[in-house]
Each structure stands twice: as C-alpha cells, then as structure tokens.
C-alpha cells in the first residue's frame, strides 16, 4: 500500500516551465482530493489508467493514448497520469481536468506528433503549454510569430525609461478627463522624441550641417519639459518615433481601448541662440465606448 505524502516546499524556476515535482504540486491543489476528501478512510492506492484514456477537459471531450500524456516526463500531464495521484472522473468515466479545453486539442497534437498550432492560436496555446508545463512546446512556440516578434519588441521597449508607467499614465489621464467631462472620449498630448538634443537650429537651413557647441554649464539651457501630458524618450536604438507610436497603439488597443493619434506640431520652446526644442507632439484620442 502506498501512502500519499504531503507536499514538498514549493520552489519555482524563472523560465516559466515547471519540473515534474512542481507540476504535481500545482495539480494537487486543488484538483486532486486527498484520501479524506475522496471519502476514504484509508490512504488511496495508486490509480491505474487504461491504455486508451478518455478525457473531459472543462466539458470538452478528448481521447488519447496513455503514452501520449506521458510523452514528456517533466510535465503536469505526465505527473497527473503517472498513477501517483487520484484523478476524478465524470458520469461517463472520463478523467476530468477542470480547465478550459478550447485549445487542448492543439496540446494533444503536439504530444502525439509534434504538430504546432496555426499562427492565430499561438498565444492561446502558449498559455496552455505554460499551465501544463510542456517545455518543448513552449520552446517551439516562442520561436514562432507573433511571440518571436514580441521578444524583439520588448527588447526595444526595454530601452525606454518608464514605458509601462507612462502607458498607465495615458490611460489614467484619459479616464479622468472623460469622467470629468462626461464624454465618450478624451484627448491628451504626448511628446515622442528619440534624440535629447536638437540637431539643427530653428529656421536656419544654412546651419543644417552644424551642431551647437556647448559647455557643461550650457546643458541646463537645453533641459526643459514640453507642455504635454506624457513624454517618451530619448532612446538609443535603430527603432524610430513611428515604431514607438506603433507600440503605444498596440499596447493601448490590447487593453480594449480605441486609439487614434496624429501629429499636431512640434514644441516651439526657445532654448538658446537660434535653437528651439522642435520635439514632435502627438494628440492621442482615447475612446471609451
């Protein structure tokens, strides 16, 4: 007779995938009942599974081989169907997992034959692969679009100081203005600039090839805050202002917001001599409903 031991202290890996022991721990809470919870007076015996396993994943029915579920040892599915844990069954005898089964078929197809999901399912299947701790599937999905492109985008945004904070500020300002004005939308000004210093003086084309020589004490003359709600920049990367604008629209839209923007001019703040700020200013329109 085998006694089900208590849970080991929890330890997590930083890469998002879990070891088999961690997967078992997550499975045990709360999906796996203890011997007492299952209504038994004695410790549970190891559970045996048929060669062909009927599954009920949140109401979606699947059938697969036991060897498919155990294909990769360090996964939650392998731990669940190892025989060491009790898995409840539904009224038809299908083994029940309390999880949305919409994309479980894509997970099974990978376990069966290594097939990868279509591009439009990649994000959703990646979420399922994280839940079931299927490392090989995670690795391949992260080399597919759109996840691969998202890695590149995040590398660029990592150079942007306080990007997430400023993004939240845009949303909060737009919300407050819409509430105060009882309006469907709100507008705000956003400055996006790649370079800290102006390169050419204002309205002096003959000096286009010159840079203003300044001492350290002159630096304060160039330091100012444009009269806008939020500013992004500067940064050192090939990506330009339009790339950052695309990121802003993408991330705001991902929050369910309708976003429009247009350039409404530049900052005309006078700095020194013939030099003006000239940072571009964009008007963002956030529509709430």
Curated annotation (Swiss-Prot):
Check the record and name the InterPro entries matching this protein. Answer: BTB/POZ_dom, SKP1/BTB/POZ_sf, T1-type_BTB
> Cellular component GO terms, alphabetically?
cytoplasm; cytosol; plasma membrane
Name the Gene Ontology biological process terms.
Answer: intracellular glutamate homeostasis; intracellular potassium ion homeostasis; membrane hyperpolarization; protein homooligomerization
Where in or outside the cell is it found?
Answer: Cell membrane; Cytoplasm, Cytosol
- Cell membrane as a keyword? yes
**What transmembrane ranges does the database entry give?**
none
The protein's UniProt keywords, in alphabetical order, are: Cell membrane, Cytoplasm, Membrane
In this chain the BTB domain maps to 53-141
Q: What does this protein do?
A: May be involved in the control of excitability of cortical neurons.
| Subunit relationships | Interacts with CUL3.
What is this protein called in UniProt?
A: BTB/POZ domain-containing protein KCTD7
Instruction: Say which species the protein is native to.
Output: Rattus norvegicus (Rat)
Gene that produces this protein: Kctd7
